[in-house]
Amino acid sequence: MSRDALIVGLNTYTYLRKLNAPAEDAEAIARCLEQQGEFRVWRLPEAIENSKPRVGKTLHLTLPELQRALVQLFKPSERQIPDTALFYFSGHGIRYDAGIQEGYLATSDVNPDQGFCGLSLRWLRQLLKESPVRQQIIWLDCCHSGELLNFDEADPGDQGKGRDRCFIAASRASQVAYEEMGSAHSVLTKALLGGLDPKRLPDRWIDNLVLTDFINQALRVCL
């Protein structure tokens, strides 16, 4: 079974407050997927340290770069379609109201005062609908990421060929994601890493249902 993952962690923004946790959170997820999930992982923004790739703490990522990477992940044209495609994003989320409220994943080049907010979650939903990848996993660790949970999982253009989609978000659309004081990771990423730990269930395969149940319980304790 082939598994591909795009892992994004953005600390650095031109017009928004810089963040501390996303790059470290993303790198921890990337290593976990590589070492325990047998995923082929792409990191953004990518830095090379000691001849190895890692999520860059001070690097920028533009909207076109993120869009190209997502299209390559979910609609690959020059390589075999993976059985599973996973997208993890940690960074700022934006809800912008220009007569119609819409949610965005903020890339480093966003400027909300000028109406430029980053990757539209509606665009992402449409990409997932059109994707031939059978198992699609999206983990969003940002404020307002709950906007994506309005996604209509039924794909009317592909009846009879169901998709297995799993969405895990750090917050509801009206809430702000937060970091747990004294922890090396955000609340959601800490729960993800805990749920993916093979030592927790040594005799059981960790699938989406098992992981989601663990995260729901972990977040309930934190609230």
For each predicted feature, which ranges?
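Functional beta-strand-loop-alpha-helix junction segments that form "active/interaction loops"
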Residues: 26, 31-83
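Active-site-proximal beta-strand/loop segments in catalytic clefts of secreted hydrolases
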Residues: 8-11, 44-48, 88-92, 108, ...
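Short, conserved active-site loop motifs that form the nucleotide-linked donor/cofactor pocket
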Residues: 3, 39, 165
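Second-shell loop/turn segments in exported
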Residues: 15-20, 55-58, 113
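Active-site-proximal C-terminal subdomain of hydrolase catalytic domains
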Residues: 9, 19, 26, 117-118, ...
